[in-house]
UniProtKB/Swiss-Prot annotation:
This is Holliday junction branch migration complex subunit RuvA. Has three domains with a flexible linker between the domains II and III and assumes an 'L' shape. Domain III is highly mobile and contacts RuvB. The gene is ruvA. Residues 144-148 are annotated as: Flexible linker. Coiled coil: none annotated.
Amino acid sequence: MFTYFRGELIEASPDEAVIEVSGVGYLLSISATTYRQLPEPGREVLVLAHLHVKEDLMQLFGFLEEEERQLFRLLLSISGVGPKLALAILSGLQVHEIQEAIVSNMPERLFEITGVGKKTAARIVLELRDRILKLRPSGGTKSVSRLSESSMRDDAVNALVTLGFLRSVAQKAVTESLTSLRNPQVEDLVRDALLTIRTP
């Protein structure tokens, strides 16, 4: 539902930022890494967004770099890693340092971050090593394409869930839309998926 926000940065702290877009203020949780790269309040900024939906709670997360958003989403796929811990990891090390720790099989680097236990660090390295390697330039354009598709699928599914549809129904409809549409954007996926869901 939300891919990015372009607007005026109203205020920011090491863990939150408020961006005003067309008179509406959006509160986004951010990493310390993103905070250090933000401009001064009052300046225009473009922040990439991730909408996290869990039961009756919706929370927006903001990133200045696509690479950081991708890594955030990968971390969320690990059992035991929620958005709070994922942000702590992104705040504890630079994105390239986290990637290097994972591909070099060095869970001890992640264990140095407050809140990351030894088992969680080991699980992150074990489950993400191959996926991180595929995202690197040597992995080829197909890997980047797959990531982009996965990102759009997640955004479209989350948008449909926000509209009140069951996640299983949303996932099925979005998957069908990805198959039938050519080079779709998130908005195209949501629109086509809605037609699929509402067609008897």
